[in-house]
């Protein structure tokens, strides 16, 4: 929304500058064109721009032709904005269609961050996965079958998680019955800190937090992020990187 562009983006940029952190902004084409000065500032301050559809349209609701046209258009928008072709993508609604993976590979996208087959460790996306939905109108023998995993592709997945997303618990949306908006940032801090502590104890991995300018750009969000960043920075060996850097680190070890 307008608050995100006018207020949330500048606040988050100042937050990241405060700690010298470079981040990845998966930005809708609509936002790039509606708030050009703010988005130019994101690039000027050294952050990565990733793809995120045009108007947050759901890939599952589109034809392959529509999905590809939007992908190509937003690639052009990000390239014009940042001066280089984007290498990362996050699907609106975190939804992959049957052709999303193939389209990303076809058009040179190196990594995605929309899937949740792991929490903290990148992996290669598979295409052609098949599972059998329950069909009460059919003989159970037709659907009592295990999931069949498809072929591994060259697309790297830097996973995301609903449990590391600021929006579901902290953004009120009138038309969405499961939105909240009044969950205390202290609760979110404890949830995220506990997950971080588990990963830190387990060993190496990525900690992929998803935040939004219209949520974390609120005063209570900024203060919580300061606290979380300072806590994570206090742990030896912790570094903050962009998603592109996480992807390259994963590939360098293969």
Residue ranges and their predicted role:
Residues 1-48, 230-232:
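Active-site beta->alpha N-cap acidic-glycine motif
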Residues 16, 49-52, 89, 104, ...:
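Conserved, mostly hydrophobic/aromatic
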Residues 2-6, 24-36, 57-68, 90-98, ...:
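Acidic-and-aromatic substrate-binding clefts and catalytic sites of carbohydrate-active enzymes
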Residues 18, 182-254:
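C-terminal domain-boundary segment and adjacent tail
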Residues 79, 84-202:
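Active-site-adjacent pocket scaffolds in enzyme catalytic domains
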Residues 23, 49, 111, 239-240:
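Hydrophobic beta-strand scaffold residues
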Residues 9-13, 36-39, 68-75, 101, ...:
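Generic structural signal for well-ordered alpha-helices
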Residues 28-30, 54-56, 91-94, 116, ...:
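Active-site beta-loop-alpha junctions enriched in small/polar residues
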């Amino acid at each position: 929304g307008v608050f995100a562009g006018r207020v949330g983006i500048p606040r988050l940029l100042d937050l990241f500058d405060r700690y010298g952190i470079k981040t990845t902004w998966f930005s809708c084409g609509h936002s790039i064109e509606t708030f050009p000065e703010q988005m130019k500032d994101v690039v000027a301050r050294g952050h990565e721009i990733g793809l995120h559809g045009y108007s947050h349209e759901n890939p599952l609701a589109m034809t392959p032709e529509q999905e590809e046209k939007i992908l190509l258009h937003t690639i052009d928008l990000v390239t014009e904005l940042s001066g280089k072709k984007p290498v990362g993508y996050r699907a609106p609604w975190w939804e992959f269609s049957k052709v999303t993976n193939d389209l990303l590979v076809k058009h040179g996208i190196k990594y995605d961050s929309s899937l949740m087959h792991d929490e903290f460790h990148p992996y290669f996306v598979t295409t052609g996965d098949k599972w059998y939905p329950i069909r009460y109108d059919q003989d159970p023998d037709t659907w009592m079958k295990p999931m069949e995993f498809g072929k591994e592709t060259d697309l790297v997945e830097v996973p995301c998680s609903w449990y590391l997303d600021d929006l579901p618990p902290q953004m009120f949306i009138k038309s969405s019955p499961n939105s909240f908006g009044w969950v205390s940032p202290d609760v979110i801090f404890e949830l995220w800190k506990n997950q971080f502590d588990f990963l830190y104890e387990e060993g190496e991995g990525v900690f992929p937090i998803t935040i939004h300018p219209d949520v974390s750009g609120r005063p209570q969000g900024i203060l919580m992020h300061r606290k979380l960043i300072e806590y994570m920075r206090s742990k030896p060996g912790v570094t903050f990187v962009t998603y592109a850097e996480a992807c390259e680190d994963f590939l360098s070890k293969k």
